[in-house]
Each structure stands twice: as C-alpha cells, then as structure tokens.
C-alpha cells in the first residue's frame, strides 16, 4: 500500500507538470472570450489526448525496455530531463506563437500539439513499467481540469502567470529526469 501511495503521488506530480503546459496555453486562449460550451470541449479534447498520447508512449516504452534492458532506463530519464528543459525554455516564448484555433480540426491539432509532451513522458514511464491505467487517468484528469482552469482564468492572469506555469511544469519534469538518471 505504501508503494502504491508513493507511485500515486509521483504520477500525480507528473500529471500536474504536464497539465501545467496545457494550463499555460489555455491561459492565453482564455483571452479570446470563448463560450462555456467551447471551454468544455477544449478541456475534454485535451484530456483525451493526454490519455491517448502517454498510452502510446508507454506501449512503445515497454517494448523498448524489453528489447534494450537497463539502458532504456537511462534513455527514459534523459527524455524527461530534456523535456523539462524544453518546457522551461519555451515558457519564455510568446504564447501567440503557439496558438491554433480551438474549433473543428484546429482543436484536434491543438490538443495533439499540447499533448506531445505526454507521449515522451509516457515513453519514459513505459520503460519503468508504471501502472498504465492509473497513469493515463491521472494525466487525463489533471490536463482536463487544468485546461478548464486556464481557460476560465485566462482573462485575468495570462500576462502574469502564463510563462511561470509552464516553467514550473518543466522544472518538475526536469527533477524527475534527474532522479531517474541518478538513482543507483
């Protein structure tokens, strides 16, 4: 039970970190005065992609772990480390550079682009053999809720919190990457 709680906390922190990326993008998107129905669909779509993408990543990660053994663990840690650094660096870019229309096919591309990070994290987690269902449900839940929060708060806080939220998420992933790389 103690091990499950530890895994739940660690996975929740990762899910939160990935959700912060969606939150920061949603803050910027919230400036466009979306209707509540649109906000609902955007959150659901991003949540679904944060379930699908890490699932695909975990599937591939387990395959790589089986094929390459212990070296795959170092690859997983390095991926998290690089992903964290990338999130921190891009957090200082303008949000408008990443905006895609949140309607129709644009919403699908938007959700896909926001959830690409979760594929890489899923790949790393698949190498380590985490609980798949727990992981993808946490990723989907956190990203959906944080997207909704970002969209709702966007008008008020985008200028102040936007870059910092993604930087916080990147810092958490970077820390997990370091932990995985240097745990002997």
From Swiss-Prot:
Q: Which residues cross the membrane?
A: 8-28, 39-59, 68-88, 103-123, 132-152, 162-182
Q: Alphabetically list the UniProt keywords.
A: Cell membrane, Ion transport, Manganese, Membrane, Transmembrane, Transmembrane helix, Transport
What GO cellular-component annotations does this UniProt entry give?
plasma membrane
Q: What is this protein called?
A: Putative manganese efflux pump MntP
Q: Does the keyword RNA-binding apply?
A: no
What this chain does, per the record? Answer: Probably functions as a manganese efflux pump.
Q: Which family does it belong to?
A: Belongs to the MntP (TC 9.B.29) family.
InterPro entries per record: Mntp/YtaF (IPR003810), Put_MntP (IPR022929)
Membrane association type: Multi-pass membrane protein
This entry's Gene Ontology molecular function terms read:
manganese ion transmembrane transporter activity
Q: Where in the cell is it found?
A: Cell membrane
Q: Does the keyword Cell division apply?
A: no
Note the Pfam families from the entry. Answer: Mntp
């Amino acid at each position: 039970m103690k091990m499950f709680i530890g895994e739940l906390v660690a996975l929740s922190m990762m899910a939160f970190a990935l959700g912060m990326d969606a939150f920061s993008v949603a803050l910027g998107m919230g400036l466009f005065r979306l209707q509540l129905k649109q906000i609902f669909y955007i959150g659901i779509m991003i949540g679904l992609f944060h379930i699908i993408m890490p699932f695909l990543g975990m599937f591939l990660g387990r395959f790589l772990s089986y094929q390459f053994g212990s070296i795959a663990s170092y690859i997983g840690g390095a991926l998290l480390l690089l992903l964290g650094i990338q999130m921190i660096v891009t957090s200082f870019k303008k949000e408008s550079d990443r905006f895609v229309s949140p309607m129709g096919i644009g919403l699908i591309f938007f959700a896909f682009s926001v959830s690409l990070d979760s594929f890489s994290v899923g790949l790393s987690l698949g190498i380590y053999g985490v609980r798949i269902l727990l992981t993808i449900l946490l990723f989907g839940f956190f990203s959906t809720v944080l997207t909704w929060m970002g969209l709702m708060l966007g008008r008020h806080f985008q200028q102040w919190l936007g870059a910092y939220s993604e930087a916080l998420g990147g810092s958490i992933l970077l820390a997990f990457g370091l932990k995985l790389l240097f745990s002997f």
